[in-house]
Amino acid sequence: MKQVNQYLALFLLLLFAIDCKQKQKEETVDQKVKSPDSLINQQPEPTANTYASVDISPMDMSYFPVDYPKIKMAHANTPPPVARLIYSRPHLQRRPLFNGILKYDEPWRLGANEASEINFYKNVTIQGKKIRAGRYIIYGIPHVDKWTIILNSNIDTWGLKQDTTKDAGRFEIPVSTNGTSLEYFTMVFEKTDTGANLVIAWADVVAKLPIEF
């Protein structure tokens, strides 16, 4: 009888050991499987975009009136905007603006990639010159103390290939500097008493093209 009890005790001990080993194995597996929260927070694996890669210089759009699409959605019978500008926004990336990205006295597309484009929905006046409603590419020639801004009808083009026979107007505007350096090239409209300025800014350089309407 004593021997039977010993065999029974040994059998129970063996069952206990097997059970402990199984639980330990399950805990190890659980540790390898992430919880739902962890899966939610996990970043997706980067994969190649087979349709179109994200450009390093994002395309942007500016309206006058500012935020025109929001105004149109909020108010019925909103009249058309005065102007819309489409351009790409290169950034400094620790480079100096001049002699690093731009050069004085050399034409620049005022952006990146496609030629920057401005659409006037009504006739406007710039420095006394009448500009008819329509689409134009807009580019500039930066100088030390002023910029030359050009409107040209050679639309839907890439980069900047000058065709001066299609110029709609050339305008010289002063430049200034401020204490704030902008990483991204920026063009926006600001309201004035006679219409709006097209503000052109990058790094600490600011130029303004006055538009009357």
Name each model feature, range by range.
Residues 56-100:
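Early exported N-terminus immediately downstream of N-terminal targeting peptides
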Residues 103-161:
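Mid-length scaffold segments of soluble, non-membrane domains
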Residues 196-203:
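Short, exposed beta-strand-loop hairpins at the edges of beta-sheets
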